[in-house]
């Protein structure tokens, strides 16, 4: 008797689960109709029986899977389509390698700080013809994520037909999505940037902040881009995520002497040896500033931010309240993303981010 009851109970459980699935799907379906009635008003599936309800679930779910990409393309505005396409590529890249998030943020910074946000850093060198920014000392064997931007560009082309978006725009979106993916505050990214038909090798050397820069040099470089001291300290907070090459940060003159023991690098430095920039390198948090206040910032250029009363005050503000830092960082990134290309630059919307278009469109 007990055996039969247990089987009956099991059978009733399966029936209950099936009915619950039908009810949930029906409620979801009705919610979709409420939201998109004009699209679905002629669809009226029959849920009167368990058999037809379960069959409808299986059929509609299979159709939904096959048609999801097409449906999204039809429903999204052109701008939203671009954001969705880029975000999917960025999320996938960071899921595969968390470090990539910091790399994409840095790539956007290194693009904008050299002659404005013009995608110049993405241009490959051409032997004997063109030397760009990728192999300049601040970027050589260091800047990375080019392939992610290329994938995002192709995804936009495939997913959002008849939408023209620059590679500089894609860099800006990818950086924003990386910040959010790693736990930072998201922020708005306006589209409309253009891509330069050239790059500036020497500009990367002269305009980008370096790990050995003292505070005076850093202030001048940020002032040249119209950033305040507070914005400079906020943007330095990008070092709350990511790694740097040991040969860059764990060498005399670049590393903060007080943090020398934190450099987890081998005695023989190679470009493949990496040093995390704070103690939580995959989380967009305030630990970078906590480390600075404890005199444990890794890079010399970071630790000197505590050597001046004004900048040290901002470091303390951010160490005391992560939300203040996240808000200021987001605002500074928006401002940085608006840095214009050099006056007179020849501009276009590149078809492929790593090379200029075969024939230039008129200057934009």
From Swiss-Prot:
Indicate where this protein is primarily found: secreted
Q: Where in the cell is it found?
A: Secreted
Task of the protein: Removal of H(2)O(2), oxidation of toxic reductants, biosynthesis and degradation of lignin, suberization, auxin catabolism, response to environmental stresses such as wounding, pathogen attack and oxidative stress. These functions might be dependent on each isozyme/isoform in each plant tissue. Suggested to catalyze the deposition of the aromatic residues of suberin on the cell wall and thus play a role in cell-suberization.
Instruction: Tell me which residues bind Ca(2+) 1.
Output: 111, 114, 116, 118
Q: Which PANTHER family match?
A: PEROXIDASE 59 (PTHR31388:SF264), PEROXIDASE 72-RELATED (PTHR31388)
Q: Which GO terms describe its biological process?
A: hydrogen peroxide catabolic process; response to oxidative stress
- Give the protein name, as stated in the record: Suberization-associated anionic peroxidase 1
- Gene source species: Solanum lycopersicum
Keyword Signal recorded? yes
Which annotated residues bind Ca(2+) 2?
A: 240, 278, 280, 285
**Residues at the catalytic site:** 110 (proton acceptor)
Disulphide bridges: 81-160, 112-117, 167-353, 246-265
Q: Which reaction does it catalyse?
A: 2 a phenolic donor + H2O2 = 2 a phenolic radical donor + 2 H2O
Q: Binding positions for substrate?
A: 209
* Cofactor details (free text): Binds 2 calcium ions per subunit. Binds 1 heme b (iron(II)-protoporphyrin IX) group per subunit.
Query: Record's superkingdom?
Result: Eukaryota
Q: Which controlled-vocabulary keywords does the entry list? A: Calcium, Disulfide bond, Glycoprotein, Heme, Hydrogen peroxide, Iron, Metal-binding, Oxidoreductase, Peroxidase, Secreted, Signal
Record EC number: 1.11.1.7
Binding-site residues, heme b? 239
